[in-house]
Amino acid sequence: MKDKCVLTEYTISSGLPRRLVLGLVSDLHESDPKDVLEILRKISPDLILVAGDTFERHGGTKDTQRGSDEGSVERMLRHLLMKLDDIFEVVFGKRDFNPEYSRRFLMEAGKIAPVFLSPGNHEWYFLPKDLDIMKESGTKLLDNRDCKVYIKDMTIRIGGLSSVPDIRW
């Protein structure tokens, strides 16, 4: 986020019988969510959609989990990318992130509106404590999944497409 929060408003004709206000948040990268939360409280969205990169999860030999349906080949490739990321940190230096900011964002956002999160290219995996905070905050993880949501007497479908980890960033 680099201390920059941008609000862009769009009005889209959806054909739904009622108006929905959606808050779309992306690329927090474990930065202070204060400004984002302030905007979300101000616009009072019906749903909050998180389009990836809330957490910085790459590199290392951590106790990790990408998703319950991860196959052995995907797991092997993810672990290979994690090792490459470790090498990049040795060569270029380790960056400072604060995972507490991501946890605070999800907890506070969940008090504003239902939250749906799709992983981004910086979220190669989730730690068990990340999944715990999603559960505790009521955040619905959409990792190549969709779900039906009943809101304002309407049923809508929300889906999340996961990013393939990208080491070029």
For each predicted feature, which ranges?
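Core catalytic region of metal-dependent phosphoesterases/phosphodiesterases
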Residues: K34-I151
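Short hydrophobic segments within beta-strands
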Residues: V25, V50-A51, S118, G159-L161
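A short acidic, often aromatic-flanked loop/helix-cap motif at beta-alpha or helix-coil junctions
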Residues: P17-R18, C147-Y150, D166
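Acidic, histidine-bearing metal-coordination/catalytic regions of metal-dependent phosphoesterases
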Residues: M1-K34, R41, K62, R75
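Short, flexible loop segments at the rims of nucleotide/cofactor-binding pockets, characterized by
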Residues: L24-S31, F92-D96, V164-P165
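Structural motif
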Residues: L20-L22, D46-L47, I156-R157
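Short, glycine/serine-rich, charged loops/turns that create anion-binding
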Residues: H29, F55, H122-E123, S163-P165
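Binuclear metal-dependent hydrolase catalytic cores centered on His/Asp/Glu-rich metal-binding motifs
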Residues: D132, E136-T139, I151-W169
